[in-house]
Amino acid sequence: MTIKKEPVDVVIVGFGWAGSLMAMELASTGLKIVALERGEQRDTYPDFAYPRIVDELTYGVRLKLFQNISKESVTVRHTTKDTALPYRRMGSFLPGDGVGGAGVHWNGLLWRPLEADLRLKTVVTEKYGASFIPGDMTLQDYPFTYSEMEPYFDKFERICGASGQAGNLNGERIDGGNPFEAQRANPFPTKPLLYQYSAMLFEKTAKEMGYNPFPGPAAICTEAYTNPYGVALGVCNYCGFCEKFGCYNYSKASPQTTIIPALRQYDNFELRCKSHVLRVNKDSSGKLATGVTYIDENGREVEQPASVVILSAFQLHNVRLLLLSKIGQPYNPETGEGVVGKNYAYQMLGGAKLFFNEKTWFNHFAATGASGAYIDNYNSENFDHAGVGFIGGSTVSAHVTGGRPIEQTVTPKSAPKWGTGWKKAIRDSYLHNMSIGVSSSVMPYKQCYLDLDPTYKDGYGLPLLRMTFDWQQNELRMTQFMAGKTESMVTPVFATPILTTSWLA
């Protein structure tokens, strides 16, 4: 028998970044708010306390902070002609689980969009003509401009205690910042993260080649700081355990370090963990949400009536809940009609790994998730695309996140894969390598979308989300272009000898 709770004003589904921000902003209005999080309760202490959290096997390899994909996953296929199969082993994307969601285990990279990013279809059409856009690319402008969003970008940076160097402050170009960034109203709340030696080498090379290097924008605090909610953050100690880990030092911004301590003060807010939402309920017209139905920690079905329902789970789960609840028109790739599940896109990563001799040392273990030197010269519309044959672009960086022994130990391609020779290669290369990373955009296509799988179901008997996605020629051309640009930086411009390099795509 379904348990029916007392109605509330607002129910929030998913309690990561979006859910906690919505709860905080609404709590001050006096509305009665309930947040439902399907994972467990987690806080900086005791869950992320040192030394527990710096356990690479538990958190980095066994992925303790992530969704249990044995109970719910997505199915994946490349084209509509393929049979989708379940995503059984975490790899490319890592949905979080528990309070804080993916906002706990992220690296803290805190980029604003460029002005062109939000009106890319218009910009591309005006510069190169409508025929420059491939026929299967469903490029669209966003329904808002950068100037409309800037106050909210600014507020979130202040909530996070973000670190970085402004490059365009109220229209004034600032040396040392990103010269391509859109205008910002205020400087970063805290100073940039320190460079590792690899970033220093990259910065020197980039300047000599005519590029414009700058420190990466990060949701990682570099000074003692109290945010607008009255929550104090600590100073980063460069421990090298950001991605896949919670921050024990109160330095990396997360819901736990920036919002939840202030939110706890409101009696009109309630958080229920281990509450797995199955669907959004609607009235008889099918046009008005009336609440949600979820399974509680004791396995009971519960109905929570609410005047307002906010879906703030991981993006894949929001789409699935809309489809399961029959809200909105599902996207149809054959006709182009519908919006739910349309325009699924991802990102493309690559880079060059550089190995040096014993005279050049890199202490990668002193790192953060977002420190490093970057260039934006080949990002978005910051360069002329007329002769390159693709839309989009990349940031290029010397960005080191740590020197952890299991996941972040690298050897040259020529090294043995096991045994004494492998051990020697580890000793020879651990402190004598660096990488140049490339993070690239991916455009939307009519054949890349999300819908419900007709075969596979989750532990509650509901269809899994099906992902149809593959790399397209536009992105493959971009990757080859960026490989050439990146490898051109790996030259004698570096003052120290480079033994080998390898392109990783």
Positions of the model-derived regions?
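Conserved redox-cofactor binding core of oxidoreductases
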Residues: 59-61, 65-76, 85-92, 123-125, ...
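N-terminal Rossmann-like FAD-binding beta1-loop-alpha1 element of flavoenzymes
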Residues: 9-35
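A short, basic/flexible loop-to-alpha-helix module at the beginning of a structural domain
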Residues: 1-7
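A glycine-rich dinucleotide-binding beta-alpha-beta segment and adjacent secondary-structure elements
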Residues: 7, 216-220, 238, 273, ...
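Residue-level detector of alpha-helix initiation sites
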Residues: 12, 16-17, 193, 197, ...
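FAD cofactor-binding and catalytic pocket of flavoenzymes
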Residues: 78-106, 112-113, 117-126, 133, ...
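Glycine-rich loop(s) and the adjacent beta-strand/alpha-helix scaffold that form part
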Residues: 28, 32-34, 39-56, 249, ...
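Conserved N-terminal glycine-rich FAD pyrophosphate-binding loop of Rossmann-like flavoproteins
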Residues: 40-65, 96-108
